[in-house]
């Protein structure tokens, strides 16, 4: 007999993990979360040394809406007997290793996460008025589902396939290549690119013969962490943003890009000091090249390595670069889950690759109103620059659970706005 529950989450990344953590406060809610991996892991390939979060630790799984929930980061510190040393360390942000360990600790304590359960298909049973979730370990019925399968690593069109010497940054710590004596090129001017460049500079994977850092941006730009920029990452801002016309939303997202895609000031200063010490104090050979304003247009195999053809955006110059190892820190892109062919005829799309998402993170679809398809990390175009970030995940999770339960279990009422983002407010 197939088990029937109130809610099934597909994927156990931080966003669905946040929903799972908050759901433990709701005794009458029966929910399950499935993941294809054998255990919890969060971007294991990017857990490189001296790599820090861009958000403060209080923006954890639960604290923004339920600070007494046992899955808070503060409780993690207490349970691991490091609360006082953490405070004494005066860390502005925590390392990715520690935040990953916090997420793993929370996941291992929950009894409604099922690993090695690959979701293969989701259909809707019209007779039962329930979603049918087919997994590698059996079938389940659910009144609501939440898609949290994440985004896919993005590689430029010039990259035809990945190899041992040409790959995405998300695999760096899994591959741990020996870069000793090799010419290295890091492509991508965001935080991941900065983290890889700094570690390569320090010889984390061996002393490289040459290191190049290529970015499309016109400089290695800092993350915009100004106080008023942080207001973009509040529920008040999202409520105003979502009601704007589509072209205005696109314009704002372009303007706000450096609030999420820039490099922390600490990272930039650390890199600059490393370069100063290497070249001005130790007087080492200048085997480092910083190459902004360039796009890699062609990637060709060249002997045991690679030849990169680049185009300069400002002076239209063309350059070539020989490299033994090329690492693309080029981010992630949305991809439609491959488990929805049965449901797709019922779902309203914004375009062929983008769902039409309502304010409450449900998809528009032609099924019964009491059955909801929720999505997380799939609606930046409608919900703002904060959507793919951790900053508002607890608030979003609470909003989803309030909708599932049909009442406000979590108080999400907003204080008077500091900034009047819309006219008439």
Curated annotation (Swiss-Prot):
Top-tier EC class: oxidoreductase
One cellular component (GO) term of this entry: cytoplasm
Gene3D superfamilies cross-referenced by the UniProt entry: FAD/NAD(P)-binding domain (3.50.50.60)
Main location: cytoplasm
Cofactor entry: FAD
Keywords carried by this UniProt record: Cell membrane, Cytoplasm, FAD, Flavoprotein, Membrane, NADP, Oxidoreductase, Plasmid
InterPro entries: FAD/NAD-bd_sf, Lys/Orn_oxygenase
Annotated coiled-coil segments of the chain: none
Positions with a binding annotation for FAD: 8-14
Region forming the signal peptide: none
Subcellular location: Cytoplasm; Cell membrane
E.C. no: 1.14.13.59
Biological or metabolic pathway of the protein: Siderophore biosynthesis; aerobactin biosynthesis
Any one Gene Ontology BP term: aerobactin biosynthetic process
Job description of the protein: Flavoprotein monooxygenase required for N-hydroxylation of lysine. Involved in the biosynthesis of the siderophore aerobactin which is a chelator that mediates the high-affinity iron transport systems induced by the organism under iron-stressed conditions.
Protein name, UniProt field: L-lysine N6-monooxygenase
Species, as recorded: Escherichia coli
Gene: iucD
